[in-house]
A protein has these predicted regions:
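Iron-sulfur-associated redox domains of electron-transfer enzymes in respiratory
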Residues: 106-317
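Transmembrane alpha-helical segments of multi-pass membrane transport proteins and ion-pumping complexes
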Residues: 14, 18-23, 52, 98, ...
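A short local structural element in Rossmann-fold oxidoreductases
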Residues: 25, 70, 100, 196, ...
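Short, amphipathic alpha-helical segments
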Residues: 2, 6, 14, 18, ...
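Conserved Radical SAM active-site core
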Residues: 39-40, 45, 55, 64-124, ...
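Ferredoxin-type iron-sulfur electron-transfer modules and their immediate structural context
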Residues: 1-52, 56-59, 63-66, 316-317
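Gly-rich Lys/Arg/Thr-decorated short loops/hinges at beta-loop-alpha junctions or inter-strand turns
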Residues: 2-7, 30-33, 76, 94, ...
């Protein structure tokens, strides 16, 4: 990455007035025969030179990861190396997408998972409802493909979503009866991190209900305490959430990692027989992956749907 955020372009005329040199309080700018130059070792990226230039020859050069972070968790150290502050990071994953060099990546547990399988332990995959939109193959065939990777069982997290719906509905009704002005859902780990780290005043309005991943993992562990639970998740946030529940959620893999496993093992999803869906899962449980899915599920099961008036936050911005 660039060491400083401001550069002099070829629009510079090496003018006589040289306002940029006077604006810089660190003496970082020198003017040659054709244009000015900024010394990256002296520059503190204050931007005063850019503001002073009448030709707009000095521009701001953004660092993609820093610019993409919505909470200012990424910055350079004294050596110019980027670092992510875990006290600020909400694990939204925007920096990973923004970095053109692929320098930011998630911690992977794939080797750990296969070690558990090799040791003969019952490794159970917990699949998020959004997986259905990630592959061209039928959703049931994708579930079969996951089983062929060596998992002892494949459980839909939509099962836990039903429990989340019931508990969140009851909590919402109780809060409204007590006079609360509103309540937010609690399933998105990045939202929860944002509240805890940057908006603590909002925490009183957030539902205390666990996410579907937690309830699904609890159910698996209750049936078989020896089971190793692996969440197949759509986002970086789920990995951070799993760290809060290490006793029931053992590992997390992303959809990208799942696709890599299919390719590495040469599993042709289209050629597989589709796995049957769990008949105990209500339709609204699979709708959690959609925008306002949690709220719509609560609304659909509420005694009086008109009590639920949703306000939707769509997207990371």
């Amino acid at each position: 990455c660039v060491k400083n955020k401001y550069i002099v372009t070829n629009l510079c005329r090496a003018c006589v007035a040289r306002p940029c040199t006077y604006a810089c309080k660190k003496g970082a700018i020198t003017v040659g025969e054709k244009q000015a130059h900024i010394d990256p070792e002296s520059c503190v990226s204050c931007g005063m030179c850019m503001d002073a230039c009448p030709f707009h020859a000095i521009i701001y050069q953004p660092v993609p990861c820093e610019e993409s972070c919505p909470v200012g968790a990424i910055s350079k150290d004294e050596h110019g190396v980027e670092h992510i502050d875990p006290e600020k990071c909400i694990y939204c994953g925007k920096c990973m997408v923004a970095c053109p060099f692929g320098a930011i990546f998630e911690k992977t547990f794939m080797i750990d998972i296969f070690r558990e399988m090799k040791a003969g332990k019952p490794v159970v995959a917990m699949v998020a409802p959004s997986l259905g939109g990630q592959f061209k193959a039928d959703y049931g065939k994708v579930l079969t493909g996951i089983k062929k990777l060596g998992f002892a069982d494949v459980v839909e997290v939509a099962l836990g979503a039903n429990i989340t719906t019931e508990k969140e509905r009851e909590e919402f009704i109780e809060r409204m009866e007590e006079g609360a002005s509103f309540m937010t859902t609690s399933c998105c780990p990045s939202w929860m991190n944002l509240v805890r780290k940057h908006m603590p005043e909002m925490e009183q309005y957030v539902s205390t209900t666990y996410s579907p991943m937690v309830y699904t993992a609890q159910g698996i562990k209750e049936k078989n305490p020896e089971a190793i639970t692996v969440m197949v998740a759509p986002c970086v946030g789920k990995r951070s959430e799993s760290y809060l529940y290490r006793d029931i959620v053992d590992y997390v893999i992303s959809y990208e990692e799942l696709e890599a496993l299919f390719k590495a093992t040469e599993i042709d999803l289209e050629s597989l027989e589709p796995m049957e869906f769990d008949p105990n899962i209500a339709g609204h449980g699979r709708g959690f992956a959609m925008i306002s899915g949690v709220t719509q599920s609560v609304k659909a099961t509420a005694p009086d749907p008109n009590v639920v008036k949703e306000v939707v936050i769509d997207g990371l911005n």
